[in-house]
Amino acid sequence: MKRVVLFLLTNLAVIAVLSITARILGVDRFLTANGLNMGMLLAFAALIGFGGAFISLLMSKTMAKWSTRARVIERPGNQDEAWLVDTVRQLSKKAGLPMPEVAIFDGAPNAFATGASKSKSLVAVSTGLLQSMDRKQVAAVLAHEVAHVENGDMVTLTLIQGVVNTFVIFLSRALGYLVDNFLRGDNEESTGPGIGYWISSIAFEIVFGVLASIVVMYFSRKREFRADAGAAKLMGDRRPMIDALRTLGGLQAGQLPKEMAASGIAGGGMMALFSSHPPLESRIAALESATPPSTPTPSRRGS
């Protein structure tokens, strides 16, 4: 859950900075100088929308480490850290991925994966999770996070965020222009956007931004089911993932920082529409009803 919320908040911050900069530089005044230029507005919205999303993606790993105070294991200091690194290495090898950075952070049970690409990823687990689960369950959680990396979920989320950013910026400014024209009336000569445009476009941007987050969280929940299935495949058995989820259901799952809420193993919001994760019961049911992952059959040799 951590990854998505961090990504969303970073994205909002970047979009806000880019939007304010554009306003200061007079981009809005240019777009409305001779009536609203819809084509140029759409191009501007796409540039800011996708630009903000990709900047957030590039910052994701650094922000994740900072917000959780995660410590990257460069040299294992004990047997548990050595096991953790070795398990991630084995799972990554099965998934055909480069070895990600492995980190530990203090807190209640949770885990996350993040990074701008499969070759620059990070897998982190909390001390609370390591203390509350047996190694097979922890391995399943690690497999879930490795599956996120294998599925390219951060890049997918970035593209989705870029699309919704574009629509938010485009619609908020287009409606702001209409509101401004309505408030001015037909008799007032237009000399660029007025106060009605500035206030209404910002208000629309906030409202549409909240609605857009529902779309992003919907796709995030879908990716969680895929990561659970991917974990079962990497483990060669769905039971460890089911057991891990049941263990989480009996614990007080750690609340990752709001800006990181989308890539943790557990979590969700107070309202289902704004939750980055499906209910644990739904995830367990999906795993139980899925076809068991195939395991290699030993070849028979003739005597």
UniProtKB/Swiss-Prot annotation:
Cofactor(s) the protein needs: Zn(2+)
Parts of the chain that traverse the membrane: 4-24, 38-58, 152-172, 199-219
Alphabetical GO biological process terms: proteolysis
Main location: membrane
Membrane topology: Multi-pass membrane protein
Keyword Hydrolase carried by entry: yes
Annotated keywords: Cell inner membrane, Cell membrane, Hydrolase, Membrane, Metal-binding, Metalloprotease, Protease, Transmembrane, Transmembrane helix, Zinc
GO molecular function: metalloendopeptidase activity; zinc ion binding
Active site: 145
Positions bound to Zn(2+): 144, 148, 224
Enzyme Commission number(s) of this protein: 3.4.24.-
Enzyme class name: hydrolase
Subcellular location as annotated: Cell inner membrane
Pfam families: Peptidase_M48 (PF01435)
GO CC annotations, alphabetized: plasma membrane
UniProt cofactor note: Binds 1 zinc ion per subunit.
Sequence similarity: Belongs to the peptidase M48B family.
Listed name of the protein: Protease HtpX homolog
